[in-house]
From Swiss-Prot:
Assembly mode: Part of a SCF (SKP1-cullin-F-box) protein ligase complex consisting of FBXO25, SKP1, CUL1 and RBX1. Interacts directly with SKP1 and CUL1. Interacts (via C-terminus) with beta-actin (via N-terminus).
UniProt-recorded name of the protein: F-box only protein 25
Metabolic or biological pathway, per its Swiss-Prot or TrEMBL entry: Protein modification; protein ubiquitination
Region (Interaction with beta-actin): 1-83
An annotated Gene Ontology molecular function: actin binding
Gene name in the database record: FBXO25
Domain of life: Eukaryota
Length: 358
């Protein structure tokens, strides 16, 4: 007799009628495990001293295979078991679906492990992890937590290997460690899924990552090829005008005196302010020099403290309004709309979080 679970399409549990009443059938894996345990006990009794060495070798080989299997399970994200890289976002119970889609479930299903290897999606995933660290960490299930820290580990290792955007990861780890410190101190007052000792170990891991990033040294590349210093001024200026982050401009300006001169250009910072903020916001935070000129560089960082900067990503998750499905655009999803492209909406990291607030 099958027992229907929350989803009526689920195979459910199998039950068998006995003289003592209905009993749930055990899965094959449980039976095999019990048989293996029974065989191990029987072997330890039956084996004599000569066969003991052979059995120990077999046992060692079995343990080695088991360790490799466990390592593969731990190293592999749970989300990789899902072939579809999309998820249906439902917020209420229906006849076909009982319950609703959670942030943790979406985090498990969407392919974030592969996304961090794509330079277009890297900043997007990091920003998403940062928002989860700030406000949604307690809403993650145990499996989602494991996926979260597995992805975070891969991000840190990627930064240590190729030195890509370490400042962004430092900000993420700082926010995550601050949140964890507050939650661990207030244990019992806040809902923190999992054992407190596990969270303390995770906090220690985060502190170790922070130290590794702090000790990160950029190796100077020795080659005879073309460098930034060899480019003409108008090309260097063009490169600076393509940056959307003020800190990137300052960092590049520290490379050579020429780049420093170009990075202090008032017109450059004016364009950056106009890109991120509205004119009404300028009027509220005007900063003038002694000569009466607007200090656009100082204004940029002042405005950044009061208003969110414009976010720009190479690739983002998309939401299909027709199907209510969240997906990566490259992977696609089974859309039934006549004109699918007209139904797609880019999803910012904050919008992703808001989709799962009930």
């Amino acid at each position: 007799m099958p027992f229907l679970g929350q989803d009526w399409r689920s195979p459910g549990w199998s039950w068998i009628k006995t003289e003592d009443g209905w009993k749930r059938c055990e899965s094959c894996s449980q039976k095999l495990e019990r048989e293996n345990n029974h065989c191990n006990i029987s072997h330890s009794i039956i084996l004599n001293s000569e066969d003991g060495e052979i059995f120990n070798n077999e046992e060692h080989e079995y343990a080695s295979k088991k360790r490799k299997k466990d390592h593969f399970r731990n190293d592999t994200n749970t989300q990789s078991f899902y072939r579809e890289k999309w998820i249906y976002v439902h917020k209420e119970s229906t006849k076909e679906r009982h319950g609703y889609c959670t942030l943790g479930e979406a985090f498990n299903r969407l392919d974030f492990s592969s996304a961090i290897q794509d330079i277009r999606r890297f900043n997007y995933v990091v920003k998403l992890l940062q928002l989860i660290a700030k406000s949604q960490l307690t809403s993650l299930s145990g499996v989602a937590q494991k996926n979260y820290f597995n992805i975070l580990d891969k991000i840190v290792q990627k930064v240590l290997d190729d030195h890509h955007n370490p400042r962004l990861i430092k900000d993420l780890l700082q926010d995550l460690s601050s949140t964890l410190c507050i939650l661990i101190r207030g244990v019992g007052k806040s809902v923190l899924v999992g054992n407190i000792n596990i969270w303390i170990c995770r906090l220690e891991t985060i502190l170790a990552w922070q130290q590794q990033l702090q000790d990160l040294q950029m190796t100077k590349q020795v080659n005879n090829g073309l460098t930034l210093s060899d480019l003409p001024l108008h090309m260097l200026n063009n490169i600076l005008y393509r940056f959307s982050d003020g800190w990137d401009i300052i960092t590049l300006g520290q490379v050579t005196p020429t780049l420093y001169m170009l990075s202090e250009d008032r017109q450059l910072w004016k364009k950056l302010c106009q890109y991120h903020f509205a004119e009404k916001q300028f009027c509220r935070h005007l900063i003038l020099s002694e000569k009466g000129h607007i200090e656009w560089k100082l204004m940029y960082f002042a405005l950044q403290k009061h208003y969110p900067a414009k976010e720009q990503y190479g690739d983002t998750l998309h939401f299909c309004r027709h199907c209510s499905i969240l997906f990566w655009k490259d992977s696609g999803h089974p859309c039934t709309a006549a004109d699918p492209d007209s139904c797609f909406t880019p999803v910012s990291p904050q919008h992703f979080i808001d989709l799962f607030k009930f």
